[in-house]
Swiss-Prot record:
GO terms for molecular function: rRNA binding; structural constituent of ribosome. One of its GO terms (cellular component) is ribosome. Keywords: Ribonucleoprotein, Ribosomal protein, RNA-binding, rRNA-binding. InterPro entries: Ribosomal_bL20, RIBOSOMAL_L20_CS, Ribosomal_protein_bL20_C. It comes from Solidesulfovibrio magneticus (strain ATCC 700980 / DSM 13731 / RS-1) (Desulfovibrio magneticus). Pfam families: Ribosomal_L20. GO terms for biological process: ribosomal large subunit assembly; translation. Gene3D superfamilies: 6.10.160.10, Ribosomal protein L20 (1.10.1900.20). The gene is rplT. Binds directly to 23S ribosomal RNA and is necessary for the in vitro assembly process of the 50S ribosomal subunit. It is not involved in the protein synthesizing functions of that subunit. Belongs to the bacterial ribosomal protein bL20 family. This is Large ribosomal subunit protein bL20.
Amino acid sequence: MRVKRGQAAHKRHKKFLKMAKGYVGARSKLYETAREVAERSLVYAYRDRKQRKRQMRKLWILRINAAARENGLSYSVFMHGLTVAGVELDRKVLADMAVREKDSFQKLAELVKSKVA
């Protein structure tokens, strides 16, 4: 018996054309091209989900370092002082404090100075 695959092919084509929606020209109109760019976009998305974690950590460290230096401390001394003082705030929270709650961050810096000195 002959197997007709039109329905499956149509569904597959629609899936990739839907994923490629928003691209310009052939990238959103032709199945083969749309499939290539859609698959590539999935590769980028997978890779960048991993990179986002690294980039956010870098950003947090940068913000903490800037705020610590405003208070006369380097990043490494500040983080070491927090460990010695028994403060268990992660970098995400510290970076948020550095940006939004400068007074609280300044108090932490004073605590670190007293513990390190």
